[in-house]
Amino acid sequence: MPAKFILRLTPPIEGRLAPLHKIWFNAVGGRMLKRKTRFLKTGKLEIRILKKFLERNTILDPRVVIGPEIGEDAAVIDPGRSADRYWVVTSDPITFTTEMIGYYGVVVNLNDIAMMGAIPKWFSAVLLFPEGSDLKGIEKVFRQIHDACHRFKVSFIGGHTEITPGIKKMILSGHMIGEVKKEKLVTAGGARPGDFLLLVKGVCIEGTSIMAREKEAELLKRGIPSSVIRKAKRFIFDPGIEVLRPARIACEVSSVHAMHDPTEGGLINGMIEMAWASDTEIEVDLEKVLIYKESRLLCQEFGMDPLGTIASGALLLAVPPSDLMPIRKAFRKNSIPFGVIGKVRKGPARVLRIDPKGSKELKPLPRDEILKIYD
């Protein structure tokens, strides 16, 4: 029986883009096979695709306690046996907006550190400016970074800045390092059956601010009052995209099993990431989720689901029933809104929406709803 072999034929480019498919020739059957390239949509990689890539990763250093894992907000490194603390390391870019990009960059990265029960300490950033940028604009971004670091007691320790050809708007990629006592480490994968699922503040906080900042003129044309737009712009400060404070309070008064800040893909993807990380089933009542009226209004204008919109400012907590009361008292004392929206169960890694009609599994969103404002 003749051996099968496959030839990959690559036509010459000749000053143009290569064809959008690859061609294989099966020598036995004499058939020409075309396989179309799958072009990925904007936004995070789908969870199942990312999981396949991460499974190929090899950790060479035994001091890595937590490496790249689905749902985890940061990596964890043990600096040595004599140390009583872990180093917690994260990276996060800002790509959806350019207004207040320096503030965004610091806060979304310190949020990731806070999710591990850690205190953010050191920040660095790669700042890529498009051609045509001026010194005034660059200075503005540096001022935003400086002010945010000063506010949250973080040291800005370096990075890289350049004018980059081929990009249309500025991109910031931030990197944060923090510390946590070894016995205080919290992970997204720590949720246990029987835990209550808490949501601190509401959803779509960051998305609401982005819509107002990026599409102000369009919203005004659609008849949205300027007062609503002004308030929505300030959502990054009030209710705020920072969750360091509520995370610290929760860790101080209770034995939090898991924390996660839902970002791209909103609350829906955030809960799914926690379920995957902890290998548990999460039951959620979406009617108990806080959605601000400004968020509902702006999402309606762009045909977006606030539950699937970038959600920095929200905080997911998995806590044992015995710790629910201490957290409730502490949050109320500090005027931090929260609600019990679900429960963690033993079962397959998934999220079930529970309502009077029954239950339905929530599927991961392939792209964040905020991208609809750019379509």
Which sequence ranges carry the predicted segments?
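Phosphate/diphosphate-binding glycine-rich loops and adjacent basic-rich segments that engage nucleotide
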Residues: K181-D238
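Helix N-cap motif at beta-to-alpha junctions
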Residues: V319-L324
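Active-site-proximal betaalpha loop/short-helix elements
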Residues: P130-G132, R234-A311
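Solvent-exposed alpha-helices and their adjacent loops that cap or buttress functional pockets
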Residues: G67-E69, I77-A83, C149, T164-K169, ...
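Beta-strand->loop->alpha-helix junctions that form or flank phosphate-binding loops
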Residues: I66-E69, P262-T263, E281-L290, G308-I310, ...
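Glycine-rich phosphate/pyrophosphate-binding loop regions near the starts of catalytic domains
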Residues: L40-V200, I205
